[in-house]
Amino acid sequence: MSEATVNDKKKKGIQKVRIGYVVSDKMQKTIVVELEDRNQHALYGKTIRTTSKVKVHDENETAGVGDRVRIEECRPLSANKHFRLVEILEKAK
């Protein structure tokens, strides 16, 4: 097998799949999702909750504020958008 045929198959790396809540849907085809991380303090052992907001591509504009969504990492779609909406787990009440 030559090297050219081996290199033609591009490997997709492991994509991070996260679950979060939509906090904004005011942009076209973009939602802002808040992700939560829980870490334990190295010395004191207290659980610390940190949140981060990421911009997510929503092609069909189906997600609304308050929805619980599953997102996955993808190639950069813009300067700040690196995630894609996979599914809506729970609609807002």
UniProtKB/Swiss-Prot annotation:
Function: One of the primary rRNA binding proteins, it binds specifically to the 5'-end of 16S ribosomal RNA.
Source superkingdom: Bacteria
One GO cellular component term noted in the UniProt record for this chain: cytosolic small ribosomal subunit
Subunit structure: Part of the 30S ribosomal subunit.
Similarity comment: Belongs to the universal ribosomal protein uS17 family.
Protein name per Swiss-Prot or TrEMBL: Small ribosomal subunit protein uS17
Gene Ontology biological process terms from the UniProt entry: translation
Any Pfam family matching the protein: Ribosomal_S17
UniProt keyword terms in alphabetical order: Ribonucleoprotein, Ribosomal protein, RNA-binding, rRNA-binding
Source organism (scientific name): Corynebacterium kroppenstedtii (strain DSM 44385 / JCM 11950 / CIP 105744 / CCUG 35717)
Lineage: Bacteria, Bacillati, Actinomycetota, Actinomycetes, Mycobacteriales
NCBIfam families: PRK05610.1, uS17_bact
GO function term, MF aspect, one: rRNA binding
